[in-house]
Amino acid sequence: MRSAQVYRWQIPMDAGVVLRDRRLKTRDGLYVCLRDGEREGWGEISPLPGFSQETWEEAQTALLTWVNDWLQGSEGLPEMPSVAFGASCALAELTGVLPEAADYRAAPLCTGDPDDLVLRLADMPGEKIAKVKVGLYEAVRDGMVVNLLLEAIPDLHLRLDANRAWTPLKAQQFAKYVNPDYRARIAFLEEPCKTRDDSRAFARETGIAIAWDESLREADFTFEAEEGVRAVVIKPTLTGSLDKVREQVAAAHALGLTAVISSSIESSLGLTQLARIAAWLTPGTLPGLDTLHLMQAQQVRPWPGSALPCLKRDELERLL
């Protein structure tokens, strides 16, 4: 016998969270909980403002329609990426497809203070990997910060994310301030320039490896092995169903590319599921999930070791 609940929620964010020039004051989303007999499965639907095509309200309408269809016996999935991902996760939990084992390691997001990063990395098992957002300030400053970190921590590898912020000139200004001897320890730089061709040229000219992120969601993107391209960053909330995520990971691995499962600032419930997906589909690759500290609370399922308060399901607004 099938049954379902849908919950709506809103989590206050830390004051300094800015996405594409807009301050994110709250993180808004939905949960779906599916039951079939004794089995239960949860999924999170939380479109990311400025990145998702669908709004939270559109996702809610699509989710409620899909849940009603599922209760009638339908087996399809919604079209909207965030709804397709959340619904497919709930189904994967319900049917036992999504393994319980999780990779709760996370590449720490660094604000540029090497002393703070040394402390955070001290307890990290295995290779030392951190992530730095670049492109928010002057490119020269970014280059100096990255160089400082790589110089201060000799076994550090950095993942950098520019979100297509730079012109070719700005990208070159950044590279100029990174010692060529350190560049091999930049694991990859996500989407440095506004166009893929400019990003490819940057990789060739500087020897700094790049990764595709936004490109994966463009209609003309195809997976190819290219000079200077080392990785793809997959954000499931922006990608679609779990099957689509698996297809993208498989396509990347077939070409020898690293596939990184990455957060779209999901709640703790969604992040714990992403940690399970990462352990399942990209074992051995550190996922990019260090975003919980941007929020003021957890919900339903806590992240191991987090001191943030965790709301229970009966504290959420129920829609169905």
UniProtKB/Swiss-Prot annotation:
**Which Gene3D superfamilies has this protein been placed in?**
Enolase-like C-terminal domain, Enolase-like, N-terminal domain
What are the catalytic residues? Answer: K133, K235
List the cofactors: a divalent metal cation
Reactions catalysed, semicolon-separated, are: (1R,6R)-6-hydroxy-2-succinyl-cyclohexa-2,4-diene-1-carboxylate = 2-succinylbenzoate + H2O
Please provide the record's keywords in A-Z order.
Lyase, Magnesium, Menaquinone biosynthesis, Metal-binding
- Keyword Magnesium recorded: yes
Q: Which InterPro entries match?
A: Enolase-like_C_sf, Enolase-like_N, Enolase_C-like, Mandelate_racemase_C, OSB_synthase_MenC1, OSBS_N
In which residues is Mg(2+) bound?
Answer: D161, E190, D213
Question: Key word Electron transport present in the record?
Answer: no
Q: What NCBIfam families is this protein classified in?
A: menC_gam_Gplu, PRK05105.1
Q: Function, please?
A: Converts 2-succinyl-6-hydroxy-2,4-cyclohexadiene-1-carboxylate (SHCHC) to 2-succinylbenzoate (OSB).
Protein name per UniProt: o-succinylbenzoate synthase
Q: What is the lineage of its organism?
A: Bacteria, Pseudomonadati, Pseudomonadota, Gammaproteobacteria, Enterobacterales
Protein's gene: menC
